[in-house]
Amino acid sequence: MEAIEIRNLTKTYGGDSIALYNVNLTLPQGKIIGLLGPNGAGKTTLIKILTGIIKNYTGEVYIKGHKVGVETKKCVSYLPDIEFIDPNWTTAYSISYYKDFFNDFDQEKALMLINRLDIPLNKKFKALSKGTREKVQLILTLSRQSDIYIFDEPIAGVDPAARDLIFDLILQNYNKSATIIISTHLIADVERILDQFIFIKKGSIVRQGNVKEVTSQKGKSIDEIFREDFRCLADF
């Protein structure tokens, strides 16, 4: 069974603004997949459909054989591109909340990662630096034992050194049989950890493939291919 199947997915806003158009994708289990495109390409809309936040669309979307809904929320761990922790919660309370809310949450793992990164347990979220707040949210997401992890722009607001740390955390601590989807416009930073990639432009899939196969065939990095593809597309 594939991790995710998408058939003829189209999403419009206001009747004439197309966010996604006729998207067809099959994503396997156990791979790290980059959803790559510029800001406004449709990445976040696609993610919000996969996570059940957006429900009004045409087409079919299946996760682990189930239509997106209550059942699929149980197997998807999602890190949005915004801060979602209550600013007055401490790190310790956030961990306790996740433990109570998610049956698959590994509290010991979360505490181990918090300790490893020297993050204070009893400070309120709003008192932490921006980079530390992002690490707390990432740790909470990774500490669920999920079949699918979805990260929406996890490195957009952090410096290059912190980006490497975030990717190392993901590589070292996710469920190895799971599918990971990382949405980003920072291609050069993410491609080293990807198995597969998807290029999305103006709501349509314009290229996808296996990272090793495509880079070997083209003799170029995914970042270079992305720049060429999107420079050509900008001419039309």
What are these regions (language model features)?
Residues 208-209:
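ABC ATPase "signature
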Residues 1-22, 29:
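A short, flexible loop at the N-terminus of ABC-type nucleotide-binding domains that lies
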Residues 81-136:
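ABC-family P-loop ATPase nucleotide-binding domains
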Residues 149-153, 158:
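Catalytic Walker B motif of ABC-type/P-loop ATPase nucleotide-binding domains
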Residues 36-38:
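The feature captures the beta-strand-to-loop junction immediately N-terminal to the Walker
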Residues 58-72:
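Conserved ABC transporter NBD signature motif
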Residues 51:
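Helix-to-loop junction immediately C-terminal to a conserved catalytic motif
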